[in-house]
């Protein structure tokens, strides 16, 4: 069995599920999952867990993510991104400066509340929102709290001849953030219709775009029996507090017994040497093995 983490560069035009399906065929391994859905049009880092690493994938999805994208001011779309149909157009504000945009972007820092877009996989009454949207049905969408730790403009304002304005941005955000909704809400705060015209995920769960592999690159390496694209399972627990255990504690964990450890963290990644051997969960004053990986 193959075990480990893959830093996949998902290309535009495929869903996260498509990427997993292709890797299952390529690696001849059924036990593969991804750490955080990317929309089909979005390029970027998609953490992939293989074999035993699928047992820690949930801890990768909790990690914050970094995106780089582009906002277009002047019209909104059904999907809040460039793939949708135009819903409304508006003239740019009489005064639209880089200083005003920057100042407005700072108002989104910290904890904010978002309403997920209709074209999203959020479920309401057992159905995904995009199913309601495609059927032309309206439904009340649940608002959610997310955290924005960075939101900044990374290019000058580019005014076009057809009355639009575009600029690039970078955002660091918590799990569950809809960046296209952030682009729409920014436009609303500036008093103009808007949408997200480009997006790529540049970092997720400690993995970066610079070191990511495309499916084509992985296929080429597999054909040469080269597996260096596969990272150790330890990458999957990089965001959990680490606790090094001794031989006696290792034996106790292997039997599923509780341990008394000097920590107050709700979850710990237990290491024996350089290897992660279990995820421990705080129960009263002791730690119980939640997932044993040996």
UniProtKB/Swiss-Prot annotation:
Residue positions of the active site: 39 (nucleophile)
Taxonomy, superkingdom: Bacteria
Record field: catalytic activity: uridine(55) in tRNA = pseudouridine(55) in tRNA
First-tier enzyme category under EC: isomerase
Role description: Responsible for synthesis of pseudouridine from uracil-55 in the psi GC loop of transfer RNAs.
Keywords per UniProt: Isomerase, tRNA processing
Family membership noted in the UniProt record: Belongs to the pseudouridine synthase TruB family. Type 1 subfamily.
Enzyme Commission identifier(s): 5.4.99.25
InterPro entries in alphabetical order: PsdUridine_synth_cat_dom_sf, PsdUridine_synth_N, tRNA_psdUridine_synth_TruB, TruB_C
Protein name per UniProt: tRNA pseudouridine synthase B
UniProt signal peptide: none
Organism classification: Bacteria, Bacillati, Bacillota, Bacilli, Lactobacillales
A Gene Ontology biological process term: mRNA pseudouridine synthesis
GO molecular function, one term: tRNA pseudouridine(55) synthase activity
């Amino acid at each position: 069995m193959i075990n480990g983490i893959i830093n996949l560069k998902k290309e535009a035009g495929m869903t996260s599920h498509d990427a997993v399906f292709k890797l299952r065929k390529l690696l001849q391994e059924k036990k593969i999952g991804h750490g955080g859905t990317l929309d089909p049009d979005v390029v970027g880092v998609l953490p992939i867990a293989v074999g035993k690493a699928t047992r820690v994938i949930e801890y990768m999805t909790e990690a914050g993510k970094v995106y780089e994208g582009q906002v277009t001011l002047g019209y909104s779309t059904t999907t809040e991104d460039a793939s949708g149909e135009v819903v409304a157009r508006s003239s740019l504000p009489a005064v639209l400066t880089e200083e005003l945009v920057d100042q407005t972007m700072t108002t989104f820092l910290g904890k904010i509340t978002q309403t997920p877009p209709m074209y999203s996989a959020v479920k309401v009454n057992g159905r995904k929102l995009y199913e309601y949207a495609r059927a032309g049905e309206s439904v009340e969408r649940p608002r959610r709290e997310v955290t924005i730790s960075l939101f900044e403009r990374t290019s000058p304002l580019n005014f076009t001849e057809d009355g639009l304005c575009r600029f690039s941005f970078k955002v660091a955000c918590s799990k569950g953030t809809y960046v296209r909704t952030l682009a729409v809400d920014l436009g609303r705060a500036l008093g103009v219709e808007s949408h997200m015209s480009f997006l790529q995920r540049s970092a997720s769960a400690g993995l970066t775009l610079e070191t990511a592999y495309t499916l084509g690159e992985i296929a080429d390496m597999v054909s040469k029996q080269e597996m260096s694209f596969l990272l150790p399972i330890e990458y999957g627990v990089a965001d959990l507090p680490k606790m090094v255990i001794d031989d006696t504690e290792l034996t106790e964990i292997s039997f599923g017994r509780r341990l008394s450890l000097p920590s107050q963290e709700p979850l710990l990644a237990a290491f024996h040497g350089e290897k992660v051997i279990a995820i421990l969960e705080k129960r009263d004053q002791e730690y119980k093995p939640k997932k044993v990986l040996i």
